[in-house]
């Protein structure tokens, strides 16, 4: 697919990421301006790279014409909280918004991955206004604590270092460290 076509596909997702970041940053600001504790510590986002989209489509056997329906995380938002209790508070804030609709949830807090990875992933529908009118897009929102984010970064780096074939002794040490962290 040519570069210009990819730009036109990804442009609305870039808009969605920018708008969502602004909305979540506004939640932080509103809480702080009113001397309230904000359940959101920080927010970031990204649009998945073309190579990552193509790799995922190949791995999951997704045809090009189904890309926007089946690759749910082209737009990604990460919300970092201080405490685990804040995660459900943030999920409720999202649930109660009129500009976002939750499509699905993957709860890696209740169903911790074998590696020890923990997070709450929400797939939402979000509408952006484009030159051609409104576009309803999907975005993935990952909600986790600072400790969980640190953990996910280390785990991802190790998976990358070992090219997805992490030695059992490293995986075991990683899992044991997460068990210890979870009890702190």
Task: Cite the ranges covered by each PLM segment.
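Long beta-strand-rich cores associated with HINT superfamily self-processing modules
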Residues: 68, 81-181
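Short amphipathic alpha-helical segments
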Residues: 73-77
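Charge-rich, low-complexity segments
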Residues: 1-72
